[in-house]
Amino acid sequence: MALNIENIIAEIKEATILELNDLVKAIEEEFGVTAAAPVAAAAAGGEAAAAKDSFDVELTAAGDKKVGVIKVVREITGEGLKEAKAIVDNAPSVIKEGASEAEANEIKEKLEAAGASVTLK
């Protein structure tokens, strides 16, 4: 028996809301799916699109271990000692702009391990 999609669509068009509701329930039970799954996936996709994909890493304070923080800033930025010291001395300063979430978190961990206070924006 071949499926005739046009006939199926015609039958669906003629069905009442109650009949369509029963059809959906029967399909859900037969195939182990839910009609709510596509709606939830669409909502999750909307949230993912709204999530930030780039972060600015801001050094808010150097803390007590300023020399260690300067070393980490030099490593991250590639700047010389004088420039890295100026960045640390002038905190709050943006260390890295447009970093991915993983990169931003890695930089934050390094700076915090050196004793700095860091925020991601």
UniProtKB/Swiss-Prot annotation:
Alphabetized GO MF terms: mRNA binding; structural constituent of ribosome
Keywords: Ribonucleoprotein, Ribosomal protein
Lineage per the UniProt record: Bacteria, Bacillati, Bacillota, Bacilli, Lactobacillales
Stored InterPro entries: Ribosomal_bL12 (IPR000206), Ribosomal_bL12_C (IPR013823), Ribosomal_bL12_C/ClpS-like (IPR014719), Ribosomal_bL12_oligo (IPR008932), Ribosomal_bL12_oligo_N_sf (IPR036235)
Species name: Streptococcus agalactiae serotype V (strain ATCC BAA-611 / 2603 V/R)
The keyword Secreted appears for this protein: no
Role description: Forms part of the ribosomal stalk which helps the ribosome interact with GTP-bound translation factors. Is thus essential for accurate translation.
GO CC terms: cytosolic large ribosomal subunit
Protein name per UniProt: Large ribosomal subunit protein bL12
Quaternary structure and partners: Homodimer. Part of the ribosomal stalk of the 50S ribosomal subunit. Forms a multimeric L10(L12)X complex, where L10 forms an elongated spine to which 2 to 4 L12 dimers bind in a sequential fashion. Binds GTP-bound translation factors.
Gene Ontology biological process: translation
